[in-house]
């Protein structure tokens, strides 16, 4: 937290720690993750990106009270899941799903704010010759372009198309739409 505090006090536009934390294969943040997020926001983090659980965990938008009594908005994604790995779906654990995160920031009058937050879910598929990654929403909406995928792959893509957004919004039920094959969350100040 000292590094985060030092960065915040240095006047950088955005403080975004990337944290390796959480319980493997658990789709909700554990108490240690929640405590770390509290401390990082308290130290001045604006956006927190997590990894390690090997599954997608929720995003959260929080109102943070600063020491001077003012408030600001903080953003956290507890886990981006697995982008590419040899871990497979089993017993309801979505170890074959990951997220690509995209954020837009705008600076006006010396203030930087988040104006866009998007997630593109990904699926890891296997054949005898290839381990690859496909974008879930694009594949779901353009099945013909991904004809090399097996029926098992299609079942996983359909499941993750629906379940990923449910997981992302378990803590903060934020309005979203799908734009360019990404879950696009509405950010308001």
Descriptions of predicted regions:
Residues 1-189:
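Acidic, metal/ion-coordinating pockets
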């Amino acid at each position: 937290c000292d590094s985060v505090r030092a960065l915040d006090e240095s006047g950088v536009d955005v403080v975004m720690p990337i944290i390796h934390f959480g319980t493997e294969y658990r789709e909700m943040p554990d108490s240690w993750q929640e405590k770390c997020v509290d401390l990082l926001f308290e130290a001045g983090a604006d956006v927190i990106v997590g990894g390690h659980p090997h599954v997608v965990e929720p995003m959260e938008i929080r109102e943070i009270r600063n020491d001077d009594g003012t408030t600001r908005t903080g953003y956290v994604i507890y886990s981006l899941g697995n982008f590419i790995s040899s871990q497979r779906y089993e017993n309801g654990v979505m170890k074959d799903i990951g997220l690509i995160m995209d954020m837009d920031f705008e600076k006006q009058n010396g203030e930087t704010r988040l104006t866009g937050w998007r997630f593109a879910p990904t699926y890891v598929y296997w054949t005898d010759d290839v381990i690859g990654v496909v974008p879930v929403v694009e594949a779901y909406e353009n099945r013909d372009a991904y004809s090399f995928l097996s029926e098992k792959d299609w079942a996983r893509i359909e499941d993750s198309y629906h379940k990923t957004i449910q997981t992302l919004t378990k803590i903060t039920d934020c309005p979203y739409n799908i734009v360019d094959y990404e879950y696009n969350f509405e950010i308001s100040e």
